[in-house]
Amino acid sequence: MPTITLPDGSQRSFDHVVSVADVALSIGAGLAKATVAGKVDGKLVDACDLIENDASLQIITPKDQEGLEIIRHSCAHLVGHAVKQLYPTAKMVIGPVIDDGFYYDIAYERPFTPDDMAAIEQRMQQLIEKDYDVIKKVTPRAEVIEVFTARHEDYKLRLVEDMPNEQAMGLYYHEEYVDMCRGPHVPNTRFLKSFKLTKLSGAYWRGDAKNEQLQRVYGTAWADKKQLAAYIQRIEEAEKRDHRKIGKRLGLFHTQEEAPGMVFWHPQGWTLYQVLEQYMRKVQRENGYLEIKTPQVVDRSLWEKSGHWANYADNMFTTESESRDYAIKPMNCPCHVQVFNQGLKSYRELPMRLAEFGACHRNEPSGALHGIMRVRGFTQDDAHIFCTEDQMQAESAAFIKLTLDVYADFGFKDIELKLSTRPEKRVGSDELWERAETALASALDSAGLPYDLQPGEGAFYGPKIEFSLKDCLGRVWQCGTLQLDFNLPIRLSAEYVSEDNSRKNPVMLHRAILGSFERFIGILIEHYEGAFPAWLAPTQAVIMNITDKQADFALEVEKTLAESGFRAKSDLRNEKIGFKIREHTLLKVPYLLVIGDREVEMQTVAVRTREGADLGSMPVAQFAEFLAQAVSRRGRQDTE
């Protein structure tokens, strides 16, 4: 009979087979009531599952991340229960867990409306109040097919067909509703009280636009009402910071249907873009990078050699001219190898760091496009380092330091790092992989940085480091990448002459810091809610006259600041000064300079901030010095 070992090392012996729920009850009634599921010998199981042999057991409650994900998964099933009661002809598809929530894809004769979503949520609440048990039945394959055939659940039957080797499957019963799942799920609907449906969207069966369209119902679920309220508050704050709304309000950019996934940059937005580009160009130049420019449209033959034509063709825009096939480049790496290959290199010329602000295009699904965060046309701060194996660690360490310095300049100090190591299918010897992984790990260790190890998650051609930054709302954005590549230099015949006069393939380090300018600008807009630090602000100062008598001096101030390298403009409109101040405050201009008769007489400007602080009057030269100091701090003033 089983002896159960608990996480604290204590043991409990039973003279009969027990379920996870039985063990929880033997510890205490409170724990039994809170039990969502169990983890037996490291495997998640339902609370009703039996333990027949000696095992380790962790009781899973809503306080555990696994418990929260189980609650969310069960809420997806609850969506199915409610939908089938309200819309009996609907056919259920899949309902997985996602970050902070869940969704369910549903086939129905018409699109769901916000009123439908409200009705589904209300019915879910009514079902939760019934406090019913969720019943699990491990069911033979033939019987599963009978169950879903009788219910006309065509998509469930297709999913069964996808699992030809599964002879028994878990069916979970919510009263009259039944769903199929590996589980585990909550034992009772009382765990599902803290949920909310959040949005509706379209989707496609198996994610393929060629297949039938489905309705997707999104929701979130939490362990308690307090967590749910905090999440809703974060979402409301995120909606206030939506880069699409702020971008329109501040006149930064727009998108339109005639060019899906492409950005129309307006003067203010393009100024911001250029500030980023000029900053990154300076950073790269100071760190030994050589800037290059490569073609946008490249013959199919190069993409075949690189492997992109075979593995990435669906994401590439292609064209034809004079009986030749071309692709608009989706990435820059093959072209950078062509630059490296011009003239045989010596080991003395390595490392060679080639950088490009490379415009790329990828045929992303239209449903996945999102403002400037997910686009089809974008520019990467892309670079490739060609080096020897002995140089991998030093180059990696230098890049890590550079990346963190850049993020700090933009105001991001909370950075998460992940090291992904060799997958089962890979190219290159184990010895080379060992050296590469050790190089990346040592580079991270030498920087004193904690990181998450992700075994088996590397690309087939080399290990990688991912850099993710946290914004002011605690959201995590994966931006930077350092990817070692043993494969592409071989495929594209990149070689150098080594110290012993033999020819060797260099190691290629793919690296990006911002990722893409478009997405990074979107992150900045939402992080700062459009109130950029002075060094990034498209307009750093606006000069406003009170009456026409001060117009000439206002123009002089604008000229002086512009000649000092600042982005300043005058507002000489015949409007009340309060109106002008309010308008430019809403446009998030960092500094508002007011000029009246006294300022003309004293040759000064009255300085206000967009936050409403009155900095008093000062000579123009003094303000220029003040602004220069603010610009020099970049985004660090709020983080140090």
Curated annotation (Swiss-Prot):
Residues 242-533 are annotated as: Catalytic. Belongs to the class-II aminoacyl-tRNA synthetase family. The gene is thrS. Catalyzes the attachment of threonine to tRNA(Thr) in a two-step reaction: L-threonine is first activated by ATP to form Thr-AMP and then transferred to the acceptor end of tRNA(Thr). Also edits incorrectly charged L-seryl-tRNA(Thr). InterPro entries: aa-tRNA-synt_IIb (IPR002314), aa-tRNA-synth_II (IPR006195), aa-tRNA-synth_II/BPL/LPL (IPR045864), Anticodon-bd (IPR004154), Anticodon-bd_dom_sf (IPR036621), Beta-grasp_dom_sf (IPR012675), TGS (IPR004095), TGS-like (IPR012676). HAMAP family: Thr_tRNA_synth. Pfam families: HGTP_anticodon, TGS, tRNA-synt_2b, tRNA_SAD. Gene3D superfamilies: 3.10.20.30, 3.30.54.20, Anticodon-binding domain (3.40.50.800), Bira Bifunctional Protein, Domain 2 (3.30.930.10), Threonyl-trna Synthetase, Chain A, domain 2 (3.30.980.10). It is found in: Cytoplasm. Its cofactor is Zn(2+). It catalyses: tRNA(Thr) + L-threonine + ATP = L-threonyl-tRNA(Thr) + AMP + diphosphate + H(+). The keyword Glycoprotein does not apply. Zn(2+) binds at residues 333, 384, 510. GO terms for cellular component: cytosol. Its EC number is 6.1.1.3. SMART domains: tRNA_SAD. Residues 1-61 form the TGS domain. It comes from Pseudomonas savastanoi pv. phaseolicola (strain 1448A / Race 6) (Pseudomonas syringae pv. phaseolicola (strain 1448A / Race 6)). This is Threonine--tRNA ligase. Binds 1 zinc ion per subunit.
